[in-house]
């Protein structure tokens, strides 16, 4: 496989390309690396490759002319990658894609980036190594070369080495041990010394699953796992941030079609469905807020039926879910109850289909690591303005880029809780 690196600093690669497996692969001819310097394709005596950006602003921009000439000088470029923050995340899956080709060209950006018009002239694919900033694309290009090159047949020597590495099966790798058998009081697990290859394989699979769940749970969403794997994962002790998440279904004050503040009646579906959602995701609690006494009595009777009355034997699962429900008169009462239960005042986040919001789903997920969060869901046509003003934040609408955004509160609650917590959490 041949890599063509378009860079202003070809000397950057001298040491890493000469070391270890990459050095051996180049010596054997499995991997070839060529460099094209845009400075060699300039037309002025100063060999200029950058200029000030149109519209002003800090920094310089790589000029399109030298880069275009550099790309056209490559006889067989193959796919052309541009290392850039805006690009497709580089993953093991993408490395496998790239390894199927014979040629790969990688553009290493510098300064503020390249002239955007270059992407209209050439079939350039932006690729990102992550959400951080480097001085240039050379470090990222080296990572792409190594991850892709080691998938070339013969590169690893023992092909099974690549098959059992992290991400190769969609999971992180299991832990490794070598001599001595005991190191500073810590022993190598007995099963690895047993010689029983079947048990060892099962242990390694279990450890890979647990390591992934505890360190990179988001990977599990796309990993190939079976029912036995799920049983292992369910038994694994892990953080449960859902315990720090609470929700409240607000029936007053909410607004009607005329945008007037009103109180609305409770509905069976809202109570049951959001209760089941809260139980499924392991929430700390679900509050029904209404100041109307007869509505509170109605709620209390319904809850008694399913948690202590005839409903327990008829549908015990529903009773389990509804034990999370607490009736309160106001949002402030719910806040006080959470503070009493947890020792911390919760961060209160409103939900609304209007406006842009000021809090993202990932932000709420991060909050849960530190303190409880109370999500407010409005009935009728949404929470009243005075409720929104007293909140610590307003969640971004579920379909913030589309015009139609009229979900039932039950549907909205399920979607929001799933986005905040996710299956793996």
Curated annotation (Swiss-Prot):
Entry-linked CDD domains: TM1570-like, TrmD-like
Subcellular location as annotated: Cytoplasm
UniProt xrefs under Gene3D superfamilies: 3.40.1280.10, tRNA(m1g37)methyltransferase, domain 2 (1.10.1270.20)
Positions of the UniProt region annotated as tRNA (guanine-N(1)-)-methyltransferase: 1-241
This protein's UniProt keywords: Cytoplasm, Methyltransferase, S-adenosyl-L-methionine, Transferase, tRNA processing
Any single Gene Ontology cellular-component annotation: cytosol
Keyword tRNA processing in annotation: yes
GO MF entry, a single one: tRNA (guanine(37)-N1)-methyltransferase activity
Region (Unknown): 242-425
Biological process (GO), any one: tRNA N1-guanine methylation
Top-level taxon: Bacteria
Catalytic activity: guanosine(37) in tRNA + S-adenosyl-L-methionine = N(1)-methylguanosine(37) in tRNA + S-adenosyl-L-homocysteine + H(+)
Positions of S-adenosyl-L-methionine binding: 109, 129-134
EC number: 2.1.1.228
Record bears the keyword Phosphoprotein: no
InterPro entries tied to this protein: Alpha/beta_knot_MTases, RNA_MeTrfase_C_dom, tRNA_m1G_MeTrfase_C_sf, tRNA_m1G_MeTrfase_TrmD, tRNA_m1G_MTases_N, tRNA_MeTrfase_TRMD/TRM10
SUPFAM superfamilies with a match to the protein in the record: alpha/beta knot
Main location: cytoplasm
Family affiliation: Belongs to the RNA methyltransferase TrmD family.
Subunit: Homodimer.
PANTHER family: TRNA (GUANINE-N(1)-)-METHYLTRANSFERASE
Function description: Specifically methylates guanosine-37 in various tRNAs.
Protein name, as recorded: tRNA (guanine-N(1)-)-methyltransferase
Lineage: Bacteria, Pseudomonadati, Thermodesulfobacteriota, Desulfovibrionia, Desulfovibrionales
């Amino acid at each position: 496989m041949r890599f063509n690196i378009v860079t202003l600093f070809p000397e950057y690669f001298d040491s890493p390309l000469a070391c270890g497996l990459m050095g051996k692969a180049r010596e054997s001819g499995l991997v070839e690396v060529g460099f094209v310097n845009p400075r060699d394709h300039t037309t002025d005596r100063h060999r200029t490759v950058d200029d000030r950006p149109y519209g002003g602003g800090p920094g310089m921009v790589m000029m399109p002319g030298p880069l275009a000439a550099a790309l056209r000088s490559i006889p067989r470029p193959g796919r052309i990658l541009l290392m850039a923050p805006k690009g497709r995340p580089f993953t093991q899956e993408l490395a496998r894609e790239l390894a199927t080709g014979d040629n790969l060209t990688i553009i290493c950006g510098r300064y503020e980036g390249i002239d955007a018009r270059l992407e209209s002239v050439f079939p350039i694919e932006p690729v990102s190594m992550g959400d951080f900033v480097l001085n240039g694309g050379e470090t990222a290009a080296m990572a792409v070369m190594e991850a892709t090159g080691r998938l070339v047949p013969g590169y690893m020597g023992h092909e099974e080495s690549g098959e059992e590495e992290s991400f190769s099966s969609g999971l992180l790798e299991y832990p490794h041990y070598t001599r001595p058998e005991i190191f500073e009081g810590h022993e190598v697990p007995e099963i690895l010394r047993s010689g029983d290859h079947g048990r060892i394989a099962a242990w390694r699979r279990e450890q890979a699953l647990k390591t992934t769940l505890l360190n990179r749970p988001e990977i599990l969403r796309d990993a190939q796992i079976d029912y036995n794997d799920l049983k292992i994962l369910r038994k694994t002790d892990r953080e449960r941030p859902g315990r720090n998440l609470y929700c409240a279904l607000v029936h007053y004050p909410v607004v009607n079609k005329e945008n007037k503040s009103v109180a609305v009646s409770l509905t069976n579906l809202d109570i049951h469905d959001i209760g089941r959602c809260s139980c499924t995701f392991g929430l700390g609690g679900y509050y029904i807020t209404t100041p109307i006494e007869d509505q509170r009595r109605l709620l209390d009777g319904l809850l008694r039926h399913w948690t202590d009355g005839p409903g327990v034997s008829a549908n015990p699962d529903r009773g389990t879910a509804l034990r999370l429900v607490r009736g309160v008169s106001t949002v402030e009462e719910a806040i006080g109850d959470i503070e009493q239960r947890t020792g911390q005042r919760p961060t209160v986040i409103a939900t609304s289909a209007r406006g842009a919001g000021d809090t993202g789903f990932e932000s709420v997920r991060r909050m849960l690591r530190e303190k409880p969060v109370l999500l407010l869901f409005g009935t009728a046509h949404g929470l009243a303005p005075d409720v929104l003003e007293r909140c610590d934040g307003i969640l971004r609408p579920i379909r913030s880029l589309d015009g139609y955004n009229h979900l039932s509160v039950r549907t909205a609650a399920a979607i929001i809780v799933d986005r905040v917590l996710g299956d793996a959490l």
